[in-house]
Amino acid sequence: MKKVLVVRGGWDGHQPVETTEVFIPFLKENGYEVRVEESPAIYADKSYMETVDLIQQTNTMNVITKEEFTGLQDAIIAGTGFGGWHGGIADSYRNTSDYLQMLGGQFANHPGKAPEERIGEQSDNYVPHTINMTELGKNHEITRGISDFELTTEQYWVLHDSYNDVLATTTQKVRPWDPWNREITSPSIWTRNWGKGKIFVITCGHNLEIVLNPNVKTIIERGLLWASR
């Protein structure tokens, strides 16, 4: 039986427990033995990490020690898959630049509503936007058959590099209150090879409502299976 390690924690606003619980039954149905950990400390357990086929991480704005990151990266290089969504994977460990290099993208911001529409809640950052499939995405097993779709949620502005295989993008518009003066396109779904391991990232998934969106849920399910050893 294959093994999946779910590592969750960090900022509660991303509902790490509720969102990961959505996918645990799916993973079990697909033949995985599931272990759940509430911190990245398990990454430093070399003997255990060597047995893991897939890591699903939802751990936002946390920190990782040198030993923990080394264990995580060594496992991925050896063939363990690594996947997740939103800040749980793309805004996990700002203290470790090597993690950002391995992942291929880092959340920078999520430009929100017009200032006069903001009320001091998370919804200030929920804006309507489109997830646009790339030519690669139209034919990739993770996103094949899924058309461009609309969401009203946080729209991630991502710092990234050209080593990613980008399956979908989203474009930040230019609005009167924003400081930039041309549109910015960021990857919203990408994959990346690191050693023998495969990495899957989708930046949608701010909360339970968004991971339950049929398109987002399907992409996450396919992405996790794709990344697995």
Region spans (language model):
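Short, solvent-exposed loop/turn segments at secondary-structure junctions
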Residues: 11-12, 62, 89-91, 148, ...
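Oxidoreductase and adenylate-handling cofactor-binding alpha/beta cores
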Residues: 99-106, 148-165, 220-229
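Hydrophobic/aromatic beta-strand patches that form the interior of the parallel beta-sheet core
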Residues: 5, 83, 167, 200-202
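Helical hinge/lid and interdomain linker segments adjacent to catalytic or ligand-binding clefts
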Residues: 5-6, 12-92
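Extracellular ligand-binding/catalytic regions of CAZymes and related secreted enzymes
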Residues: 2, 29, 47, 175-188, ...
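Catalytic beta-strand/loop cores that center a nucleophilic Ser/Cys/Thr
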Residues: 28, 50-51, 119-195
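Conserved beta-strand segments of alpha/beta enzyme cores
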Residues: 33-35, 165, 198
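A glycine-rich, often tryptophan-bearing local segment used as a flexible ligand/cofactor-contacting loop or short
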Residues: 63-141
